[in-house]
Swiss-Prot record:
One of its GO terms (biological process) is interstrand cross-link repair. Its EC number is 3.1.-.-. Binds 1 [4Fe-4S] cluster. This is Exonuclease V, mitochondrial. The keyword Iron applies. GO terms for cellular component: mitochondrion; nucleus. Transmembrane segments: none annotated. The gene is EXO5. Disulfide bonds: none annotated. Monomer. Belongs to the EXO5 family.
Amino acid sequence: MSLNFLKRYLSRSTRNFQHVFEDQHGLLSIRNPEIDVPITTIDDNLDERNINGPQSDQEIVNRLIQSMVISKNEETRPMLKNEQLMNIYKHWNLYHKNDLPFINPTKYTPFEFQSIENDDISYINNPRLSVTKLLISGWCELRELYRVFAGSVRTPPTKAMSAGTKLHLKLEQALHGVIDLEDIENFIRSNTEEIMEMYDLVDNDGIFDMNPDDSIAIDWSETIIERLYSLIVCSESREVILHGYLNLQKESFVENEQEIKNPSSVLVSGIVDQIQFENPENSDDFALFDEVQKYLDVEYEQVDETPLVDLSRFFDDVKNIIQCYPEFQLKFTDLKTRMVYQIPSQKSVLDSAKFQTFYYRYFFELLSKDANFAYRCLLENAKRRGLDVDKPLSVLTTFRILRRHYHLFYNDFLKLADGKPIGFAPFDSERIDSDYEFGKLFVLGKDFAQHQEQASQHLKFIESLGGYDSLEYDKLLLPLLKTWKTPPTLRYLAARSAQFYEIFGSRLGDTTTVEYRNTFTGKIIDTKVYNYNNGELETETIHASDFWNGKLDPEPTNDFSRCQYCEFKSKCAIPKIGKISDSHASIGPEVRKFLNDVKHLQKDC
């Protein structure tokens, strides 16, 4: 039996209940015969259309079968019930009474479509993936495909999701604390507005106001630099930013600097819930951290009993200390919240959580092996977001970073202000020096003068800050209130972030864990411990790449109980199949005969 015969047979056999045709965009559509539309048979052009590379006759036949709708009674099918269904029927040009096909009938890969139709516009402006989006097999691959082509609709969080988010935040704040700057920032903003109004100033250079792009600077200073400092000083950190670049064509992650900018390299971001730096043989061993704390207390001046670290010395010194404690290793943990006091029973769900921790561990390996590589990765990350890595941060952003993390940034900011190198060659050779008017903002409106010496006015402003904050601003802020020679930028923060990753490059352990907690009480239900396996992760990465490349026909779940939670269940054939003991019994005799013929063809091939 030839492929052409099957095509003709399919066109003739299906004419009794549905028709398949291609529109001018190459979009495979399924129509109902009661609608008066032009009908075309499936022609030879289908062989080369909407598929990746040469396909065998059998593969094409399989695609034809999968695109068919296998429902018994078309007239009783429910109408489209939600936004996701309406979107996917529109995007796939489907007749609303037909069920969803099992494969993508468009010319776009899932990654391409996600990057042009997405509820979250940031994915259009900066096409990318997340670690969770690589975990396509955790529940149902077919649902993942439908969600992408429905436009990645953002749905309101459920009660369980909101409670889980609160628990994550509670654990994070219990470890890292929160410095509330709302009152002091309101004071600075109102004072700035008064100055701008009195002197008719325009904030062309972002000196006075907060730029939206500065949020990434706050993120890097907090969730990379501060968190990794906590890891080396306190043995633990939560909510740490990680990322890598997945080459979708090679189906592997980028490991060299030259490949980062390759168009096929897709940014993949994630936030690991917890990293611990510990002796796996003795969790009560804190000798390393006692040594680090002793070093900090002896070597650095303190303000408010907090050492002011000189990062130019810190990195090499701490690496030398770590070398004396070879037993300490990193452990990566993902936290899952559960409304009931039991862990998931489905193996695919457990495996998905395991691979999530594997990705985090691997990303940290990539970023920690070489500071220059991590530096380039971070710069590319910012550039893909449309950010200028050499644009000076707003004065308010710089103040926020200084206030929250003065123990890490004060000495560095002195170096930038004086135009001195920070001790990281890639940054020092690429930095752009320009005047940065940091001091102009910190003057009371009534004392402000654009072209006069303002030292005395600065003191008055600092006295006013004392009404909101007990920090010794005369020691930490006053020396910086001048025109800096080198402005703080994302490039600077990328440099320091990269150096913090590199501290741990030789201490990547092979243990990852998934911790299950009750959503409402926070109590630990169970902890799954895994041994990192790079080979397993490579296989998982290839599978995920095939999905996003459009090379993979997604596998539907074989656990029909999962279908009751799916937003596509009313138009998906899988739950219908699950309700009958023999799926062929519900298919019309013409289609059943066709399927039997195909079985014979498979035997003949």
